[in-house]
Amino acid sequence: MKTYLVGGAVRDALLNIPVYDHDWVVVGATPQDMLEQGFSQVGKDFPVFLHPKTKEEYALARTERKSGQGYHGFEVSFDPTVTLEDDLIRRDLTINAMAQDAEGQIVDPYGGQQDLADKVLRHVSEAFAEDPLRVLRVARFAAKLSAFGFTLAPETAALMKSMSASGELSALTPERVWQEVVKALNTQTPSVFFEVLDHVNALSILFPALDALKGVQQPEKHHPEGDAWVHTMMVLDASAALSNDVSVRFAALVHDLGKGLTPKALWPKHHGHEKAGVPLVAALCQQYRVPKKIQIFAEKVTEYHGLIHRGLDLEGHPHLKTATFLKVLSACQAFKEVAQFESLLIACEADAKGRLGFESRPYPQKDFWLELAKRANAVDNQAILATGVKGAEIGEAIVQERMRLIEDFVREYSAI
């Protein structure tokens, strides 16, 4: 019975990336052997055990054989005769198919160290094509490791294209897709995830509303970077630089979906794309069972990012009507959820900076809207009640007072 550290922990250690999770493979053992040593079994489909002290996962070495569609369609075999090499060959990429023994020696039967040195993402074997989730996993690894200069091996890209063409991606469950999206959004350059999916023809299958942004022209004055797809990818990466919040990054990803609906005859303008995009965001969220809180936030960013930008004109002067300022503040729950409103403004800032030549420009709208919300929320409720208003009149009086406070602040801001 031998135990090996495997997978991501070995890869990340060789890349000098902090290792947070350790996965182990046990060769030459039975489930009974593990239980007798105090491990507790958690796996149903195949034996995975938790270490009695560290609670890290230890899996018996196993082989897999395709027996049906999707990533559930596998027959798993595990017994003491399964070798480490047998276990490693079923893994997705060569850089994930390395192990380390108890003495610290690297076991690398499939060239993972060479591919690490060459910065190549390469599949271990043709069995890669048996699991459609690997298309998403490899795209995610490309995003995670892009800062190190990793690229996709041409033969792996070709295999992923054939997987897209096979129809197997439709067998993926919404939860697994969303899980990979979240992991990709948490990388430094999440755009790479979607660009790889596009490269292997998976984007149009999994995210058609994003695919529809390709080639959609925008006003060159405001968007010298190119079409709505290029802009969206730049906004996504800008959001990653500004915030670690998945909600902000997801909102950045979907904020301009409405531009994909604009008739070509109206290009490069996209009047009303904000509101038009909301049903597309809702549909995507429902398709992949995105948590409701993230969906609602993304819908708010999608619907109101245009008005947030136009809160100040190009000279930095307040630009909306008082009633519109209040409408945006109320709709975005700026009075009740201050932290969430600030996150919404960060998503809008990413939108403004996700343009060629605008990456380092200040975004005064953020501080303006935060101060506007603070001022408009400084309503003296007791003073209003002291006037004797009752029932529905109280709400109306609060609205009028907020309008007055907004007007005062706008006047003050304009005089600066």
UniProtKB/Swiss-Prot annotation:
Binding positions for CTP per the UniProt entry: 8, 11, 91, 137, 140
Catalysis: reaction(s): a tRNA precursor + 2 CTP + ATP = a tRNA with a 3' CCA end + 3 diphosphate; a tRNA with a 3' CCA end + 2 CTP + ATP = a tRNA with a 3' CCACCA end + 3 diphosphate
EC number per UniProt: 2.7.7.72, 3.1.3.-, 3.1.4.-
Source organism superkingdom: Bacteria
Domain spans labelled HD: 228-335
Domain text: Comprises two domains: an N-terminal domain containing the nucleotidyltransferase activity and a C-terminal HD domain associated with both phosphodiesterase and phosphatase activities.
Cited function: Catalyzes the addition and repair of the essential 3'-terminal CCA sequence in tRNAs without using a nucleic acid template. Adds these three nucleotides in the order of C, C, and A to the tRNA nucleotide-73, using CTP and ATP as substrates and producing inorganic pyrophosphate. tRNA 3'-terminal CCA addition is required both for tRNA processing and repair. Also involved in tRNA surveillance by mediating tandem CCA addition to generate a CCACCA at the 3' terminus of unstable tRNAs. While stable tRNAs receive only 3'-terminal CCA, unstable tRNAs are marked with CCACCA and rapidly degraded.
Listed name of the protein: Multifunctional CCA protein
Species: Hydrogenovibrio crunogenus (strain DSM 25203 / XCL-2)
Lineage of producing organism: Bacteria, Pseudomonadati, Pseudomonadota, Gammaproteobacteria, Thiotrichales
Annotated gene: cca
